Structures are given as C-alpha cells and as structure tokens.
C-alpha cells in the first residue's frame, strides 16, 4: 500500500471512529466508508456519503448525522485541514497536502518496482492469447489481441498475480492438411511440374517462397516419395516455416510467451481420450445418429454439441475441452482466454464443458477482441500499399512504428470496435497520445540532465519546505494513484485503463511544466526538490509505459 492509499485508509478509519465517538452508530452498524474524489476541487479532495448510509440506523436526517460526525472528527491525525458539509449530508475533506511530498523519496527508492501491488496475492493465472492458425501472417485482429494480451499479462504480474502466457498452436485439423497440400503444390510448381493448388489452399506469397526454398535446397528428391509421407513432410516444413514467422513478428512486437502448446500433443498423449472418458463417466455423453454428443444444455448451452462426427473425426470442441481440462489440471486458478469477435458464441459451450468436467465455470474468463479498421487520409485502408494484400501486423509496424502500434491497440476497451488513425499515429503533436506521453518522459529527462549539469543533487535529504503550487499538488496526487491504477486495470482486465492513466499523468506533467519553474538558480533547495519530483515522474511514466509495451525515450 503506497502513501496515498495509507492516508486514505487512515482517513476512512478516522471517519469510522468519529461515527462511533458521536454515538450515531455502534461499530457493528458502521458501513464500509467509501471515499470519492469530487470532480470540482471546490468540494474538497475527498467526499463521503456515510451520513446518508447511516440515516436508517440513526433515524435522523443525514445532514444532522454529518454535523455530529464532523464535531467528533480529528482532522490533524489524518492530514485534514478543513471539513465541510454539502447538500443533503455529503462530508467534504480538504487535505493538508504536505503528506504528498513523502511520495517522492518513496518512488525514488522503489524505482522499477514502483506500482507493484499484491492485489493478486500470487493467484495462478493463465492467459492464452493470439493463438493464430499457423497458416499465414498475423492480421490486425491478431495484432490487437497480442497488444491487449501482453499488456494485460504485464499488468497482472505488476499487481501480484502469478502469470503464465500461453499460445495454443492449432497444428491439427483441416487447415494444416490444406497447408501441407499447398506447400506440395508450390514445391512441384517450383520444379516445373504441373500441380494444381487445393481448392481450400493458401495462396500467399509466403507459401510460394517456401516451395521455391524447398526446391532449391532439396531438388526433386521429394517427388518420388509416397504421397502421405510427402504430405507429412510438407506439413512439418510448412508448420515450422509459418511458426518461425509468427514468433519473429511477435518478438519484434515485444510480445513473449512462456508456453507454446501444440494441439497435436493432445492427440499423442491421450488427453483427448481422457477428456471424453471424464465426460462419459459423469453421464454427459450420448450417442445419436451415429455421432457422439455432449449434453451441454444441462449446463446452460442453447443446444447439445457434437464431439465426434459420423465419420469418426473430431469436431473442434473436443480437443478444446481436452486443452481446458489440461489447463485446470496444471493448477491454474483462473484461465483468461483472449478471443476474436467471431468466437463470442463459443463462450457458453466452453463454460458448459468446464462445468461438466467438474470445475467452477467461472474459472474461465473470456475477453473478446473486437475488429480493427485502419484509416489514412480520412479513408478506410483495406490493402497494404507495400504488398497489395490485407494489412498485416508487420505492415502496420513498418508503417506507423512499434510504439504507436502497441499504444493505439491498448488505448481502447477491447470489446469495442477500434478505428486506428494511421495519420494520427505518426504525427508529432499533442493530439497523438503516444507522442504526448513519450514527449512528457523526454521532457522530464531533459530537466534532469540540466539539473545534473548544474550539479544539483536531488537524492538524500529532500526538503519540500516551500508552499506547494496547485499544479504541483495535482502532479503529486497523480503519481500517488499509479499503484491503484495498476490494481484496477488488473482486477478489471482492462489495459486501456493504464493508457488512460498514462495520458492523465502526462497531462499533469505538461500542466505543471507550463505553470511552474523547475530550475531556479535563485532557489537551489526548491530546484532540488522539484528535480526529485521530476525523477519520480520519470520513474512512474517509464514503469507505466512498460506495462503497455511502449518505449520511454530520454530524448525526442
């Protein structure tokens, strides 16, 4: 708990004690005290409606209760310099903001650790995200999912969760069979042998490139192989080729994974048979019309689901059930799946499966990533200028830059459609939120360098003996909110709350800079204190930007 949270907690405790001392209510009847931050500063730094909450118990008008509480409130004990009552009984508290200066040395001491909280209490959480089919380049939906997923993992870890990042490789099923046939056709064509592409094949330049590469490296030695042996070989070549590309794109996007989990492994290690047997033993499987069905309606699904088709092949659902059973058996207390917008209808059947396996369905959380539209020059961008094909993650990174791509994908709630303005993303103006935030960091670093050139040290015995300016107080308060912002973004699974915080902190810094002088040769002690404040801003901004995968430049 940081200094601001400690102060708020002490204020809540003093309000509760004042209620008890006033005789308005006994300790057992005092509700949980809630502190709000008034939108209008004229109404104080904090406000509570506890008097209105107590009206029924005390059988008195809320305003009279508020007056009783205020009479018995000890403000000096909790840095309160003034209290007043507003409206029907709101109690407003005006803080003596000297306590805020204690934040600065605390942030300087914490450094990279500033913002860490223990709201997660070590809970084991698995976050599965991206999980794109290994049959082509990552598109914009995958890119947004990657940015949101990685940012969420960073935030959860900062908030005290034990996080595992996982990518599920869809390396079984028809799409991989079609990939193998596509590689085979391009290989034959590269050798000058006529071979038609499969009807549902993959026609991208990457498969043509792989076919040529195989022909150059191996000649025609695969032509004489048995077809099944050849297709198995091309399956492996194609899968490795596509996964290498995906891994490189994600690494360049600053997205990492702890586990790359192969769907095929579920078949080889008997986990699919195990999941099917578990459901059968629990009475949730039946046979009908030559197919094997999961009685998912028992658990709230709108209809029962086929697991094994009449021809003996599995539907997508069965390996997915086996995969989630494996997740749960690995001891994860919370499973967070980040899925594309087209998977929304899949959630009830997956929760039904988890319940049928004997687990709490609420262990599964699904965050839906809505679609992305690109705009340039006011027009919707449908194709990449470079390739003439659909825009990929790689295209976007090269067009607008890595930092802008990461920030823009994280700055809106993932369950809302995102209009990505490419012109805004590259503009060097205050309207560009990532430029605005990075410029704030660079501006602070510039001030720190200037202070260093003057030989003004800001560590050790800091002294904020002067009266704090209004914008300085605002900036200190915003610094103090960082751990709470991390905790809220983690608990609500909302990385966009962190970009909101970054924008607010950058705004507070720019406002302070425009209103106040940081470096003043006529007042070295004040300059030292404000340089320490700037260092605290630099640490906090850097830590916050890192959570959403964005670089904090020292110069711009």
UniProtKB/Swiss-Prot annotation:
Which SUPFAM superfamilies does the protein's record reference?
A: Anticodon-binding domain of a subclass of class I aminoacyl-tRNA synthetases (SSF47323), Arginyl-tRNA synthetase (ArgRS), N-terminal 'additional' domain (SSF55190), Nucleotidylyl transferase (SSF52374)
The record's top EC class is ligase
GO MF, any single term: ATP binding
> Which residue ranges does the UniProt annotation give for the motif 'HIGH' region?
132-142
Q: Which UniProt keywords apply?
A: Aminoacyl-tRNA synthetase, ATP-binding, Cytoplasm, Ligase, Nucleotide-binding, Protein biosynthesis
Cross-referenced InterPro entries: aa-tRNA-synth_I_CS, Arg-tRNA-ligase, Arg-tRNA-synth_N, Arg-tRNA-synth_N_sf, ArgRS_core, DALR_anticod-bd, Rossmann-like_a/b/a_fold, tRNAsynth_Ia_anticodon-bd
Name by which UniProt lists this protein: Arginine--tRNA ligase
């Amino acid at each position: 708990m940081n200094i601001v949270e400690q102060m708020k907690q002490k204020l809540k405790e003093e309000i509760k004690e004042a209620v008890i001392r006033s005789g308005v209510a006994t300790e057992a009847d005092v509700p949980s005290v809630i502190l709000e931050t008034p939108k209008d500063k004229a109404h104080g730094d904090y406000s509570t409606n506890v008097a209105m909450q107590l009206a029924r118990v005390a059988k008195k008008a809320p305003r009279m209760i508020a007056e009783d509480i205020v009479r018995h409130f000890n403000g000096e004990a909790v840095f309160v310099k003034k209290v007043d009552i507003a409206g029907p009984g709101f109690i407003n508290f005006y803080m003596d903001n000297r306590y805020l200066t204690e934040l600065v040395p605390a942030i300087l001491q914490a450094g990279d650790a500033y913002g860490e909280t223990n709201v997660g209490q070590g809970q084991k959480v698995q976050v599965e995200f991206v999980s794109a089919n290994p049959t082509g380049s990552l598109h914009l939906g995958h890119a947004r999912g990657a940015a949101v997923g990685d940012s969420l993992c960073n935030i959860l870890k900062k908030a005290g969760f034990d996080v595992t990042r996982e990518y599920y490789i869809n390396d079984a099923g028809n799409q991989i069979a079609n990939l193998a046939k596509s590689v085979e056709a391009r290989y034959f064509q590269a050798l000058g042998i006529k071979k038609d592409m499969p009807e549902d094949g993959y026609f991208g330049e990457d498969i043509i490139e792989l076919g040529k590469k195989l022909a150059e490296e191996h000649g025609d030695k695969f032509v004489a192989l048995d077809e099944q042996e050849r297709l198995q070989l091309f399956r492996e070549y194609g899968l490795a080729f596509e996964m290498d590309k995906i891994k490189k794109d994600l690494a360049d996007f600053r997205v990492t994974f702890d586990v790359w989990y192969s769907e095929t492994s579920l078949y080889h290690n008997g986990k699919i048979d195990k999941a099917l047997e578990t459901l059968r033993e629990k009475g949730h499987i039946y046979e009908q019309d030559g197919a094997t069905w999961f009685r998912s309606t028992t658990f709230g699904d709108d209809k029962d689901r086929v697991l094994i088709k009449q021809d003996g092949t599995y539907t997508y659902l069965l390996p997915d059930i086996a995969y989630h059973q494996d997740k749960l058996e690995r001891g994860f207390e919370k499973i967070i799946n980040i899925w594309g917008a087209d998977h929304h209808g899949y959630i009830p059947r997956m929760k039904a499966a988890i319940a049928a396996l004997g687990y709490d369905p609420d262990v599964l959380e699904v965050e839906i990533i809505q679609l992305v539209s690109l705009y340039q020059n006011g027009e919707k961008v449908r194709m990449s200028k470079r390739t003439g094909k659909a825009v990929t993650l790689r295209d976007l990174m090269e067009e607008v830059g890595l930092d802008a791509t990461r920030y823009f994908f994280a700055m809106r709630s993932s369950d809302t459609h995102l209009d990505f303005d490419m012109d805004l993303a590259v503009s060097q103006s205050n309207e560009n939120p990532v430029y605005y935030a990075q410029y704030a960091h660079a501006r602070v670093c510039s001030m720190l360098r200037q202070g260093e050139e003057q030989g003004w040290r800001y560590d050790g015995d800091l002294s904020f003996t002067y009266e704090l300016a209004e914008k300085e107080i605002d900036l200190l308060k915003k610094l103090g909110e960082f751990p709470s912002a991390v905790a809220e973004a983690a608990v609500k699974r909302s990385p966009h709350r962190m970009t909101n915080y970054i924008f607010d902190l950058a705004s507070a810094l720019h406002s302070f800079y425009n209103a106040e002088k940081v470096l003043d040769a006529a007042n070295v002690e004040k300059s030292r204190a404000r340089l320490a404040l700037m260092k605290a801003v630099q640490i906090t901004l850097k830590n916050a930007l890192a959570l959403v995968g964005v670089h904090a430049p020292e110069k711009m």
